[in-house]
C-alpha cells in the first residue's frame, strides 16, 4: 500500500510543480505590467505677477499615474508637493462641496477634485484658470467681482415684519420646500458664470448665471417677503437680460444644476411683475 501511495505522489508531483510554475509566471507578468510606468503630461498655465518680467505661459509636468490618485486635483497636489512647490491653486474639501478648485480642464470649466484624469497617455492634459477673470497667480482667479455681485442680491431671508425674528420657526410646506431643489445645491464655484459669453463681455453689469440662480432661489422661497423688491432690482437692461440662452452654464455645471432654467423663470416673473406695475 505504501508503494502505491508513493507512486501516486510521484505521478502527481510533476503536474503540481508545473501548475505552480505557471502561477508564478502569471503573477510575475502581472507585477511587471503593474510596475510599467504610465507617464502622463500636464500643461499648466503659469504666471507670477510678483516675478519681474514674467509673462503668462504654459509649463509641462510629467507624472507616473501609477503613483497618483485618479483625480486632476491629485495630480496638481502631487506636482506641488514633489516637483514644483511654486505652483499655486485653490483647494479645500476634495469632494465637490466647497467649489474652491474650479478651473478650466481640457477646455471645460469644472472642479479639479471631481474630474478624473484622462488616462490617454498620448494626450497632454491642459489646465487653465477660470476664463475671462483677472488672475491673481497661476490657477487662482480673482473672484472679488463675482462675490460682490452675489452680495448685491441679498442672499438671505428678508421679512417685512421682523418683530418675531428668532422667536419662532418660519415653517414651510413640503411642496414649497421642493421648489428649492436644484437651486440651493449651488456651491458658487463660478464654473457657469465664467463659461458664459455674455458674462465675459458684460461681467461688470450682467450678474451671470450663478448669481441669478441664487436670486431666483430667494425669490421663490415661501418664507421670503421681498420677491417684488428683488425683481425690481433686476429691471435694468443688463442685470438679467444679457442672458441669451446659450446654455453653456447648464452644460458645464459640476453639480448638474440648471442655471439657464432659473434665469428663464425669473424672466417670466419679471413679465408678470411689469404687467402688474403698469396696471397699478
Swiss-Prot record:
It is a peripheral membrane protein. Enol-oxaloacetate inhibits the succinate dehydrogenase activity. One of its GO terms (cellular component) is mitochondrial membrane. It catalyses: a quinone + succinate = fumarate + a quinol; (R)-malate + a quinone = enol-oxaloacetate + a quinol; (S)-malate + a quinone = enol-oxaloacetate + a quinol. The modification N6-acetyllysine is found at residues 51, 55. Pathway: Carbohydrate metabolism; tricarboxylic acid cycle; fumarate from succinate (eukaryal route): step 1/1. Its EC number is 1.3.5.1, 1.1.5.-. [2Fe-2S] cluster binds at residues 93, 98, 101, 113. A ubiquinone binds at residue 201. It comes from the Eukaryota. Disulfide bonds: none annotated. One of its GO terms (molecular function) is 2 iron, 2 sulfur cluster binding. The keyword Nucleotide-binding does not apply. It is found in: Mitochondrion inner membrane. It is an enzyme of class 1 (oxidoreductase). Keywords: 2Fe-2S, 3Fe-4S, 4Fe-4S, Acetylation, Electron transport, Iron, Iron-sulfur, Membrane, Metal-binding, Mitochondrion, Mitochondrion inner membrane, Oxidoreductase, Transit peptide, Transport, Tricarboxylic acid cycle. Component of complex II composed of four subunits: the flavoprotein (FP) SDHA, iron-sulfur protein (IP) SDHB, and a cytochrome b560 composed of SDHC and SDHD. Interacts with SDHAF1; the interaction is required for iron-sulfur cluster incorporation into SDHB. This is Succinate dehydrogenase [ubiquinone] iron-sulfur subunit, mitochondrial. The lineage of its organism: Eukaryota, Metazoa, Chordata, Craniata, Vertebrata. The gene is SDHB.
Amino acid at each position: 500500500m505504501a508503494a502505491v501511495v508513493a507512486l501516486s505522489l510521484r505521478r502527481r508531483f510533476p503536474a503540481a510543480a508545473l501548475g505552480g510554475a505557471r502561477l508564478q509566471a502569471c503573477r510575475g507578468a502581472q507585477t511587471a505590467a503593474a510596475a510599467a510606468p504610465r507617464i502622463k503630461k500636464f500643461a499648466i498655465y503659469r504666471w507670477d505677477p510678483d516675478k519681474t518680467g514674467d509673462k503668462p505661459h504654459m509649463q509641462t509636468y510629467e507624472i507616473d499615474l501609477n503613483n497618483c490618485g485618479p483625480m486632476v486635483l491629485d495630480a496638481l497636489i502631487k506636482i506641488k508637493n514633489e516637483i514644483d512647490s511654486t505652483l499655486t491653486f485653490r483647494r479645500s474639501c476634495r469632494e465637490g462641496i466647497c467649489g474652491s478648485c474650479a478651473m478650466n480642464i481640457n477646455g471645460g470649466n469644472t472642479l479639479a477634485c471631481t474630474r478624473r484624469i484622462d488616462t490617454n497617455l498620448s494626450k497632454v492634459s491642459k489646465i487653465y484658470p477660470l476664463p475671462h477673470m483677472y488672475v491673481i497667480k497661476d490657477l487662482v482667479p480673482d473672484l472679488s467681482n463675482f462675490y460682490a455681485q452675489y452680495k448685491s442680491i441679498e442672499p438671505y431671508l428678508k421679512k417685512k415684519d421682523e418683530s418675531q425674528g428668532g422667536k419662532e420657526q418660519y415653517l414651510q410646506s413640503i411642496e414649497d420646500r421642493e421648489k428649492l431643489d436644484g437651486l440651493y445645491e449651488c456651491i458658487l464655484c463660478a464654473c457657469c458664470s465664467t463659461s458664459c459669453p455674455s458674462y465675459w463681455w458684460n461681467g461688470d453689469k450682467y450678474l451671470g448665471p450663478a448669481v441669478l440662480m441664487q436670486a431666483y432661489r430667494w425669490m421663490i422661497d415661501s418664507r421670503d417677503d421681498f420677491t417684488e423688491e428683488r425683481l425690481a432690482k433686476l429691471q435694468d437692461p443688463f442685470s438679467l437680460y444679457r442672458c441669451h440662452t446659450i446654455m453653456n452654464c447648464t452644460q458645464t455645471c459640476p453639480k448638474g444644476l440648471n442655471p439657464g432654467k432659473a434665469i428663464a423663470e425669473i424672466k417670466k416673473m419679471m413679465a408678470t411683475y411689469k404687467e402688474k406695475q403698469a396696471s397699478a
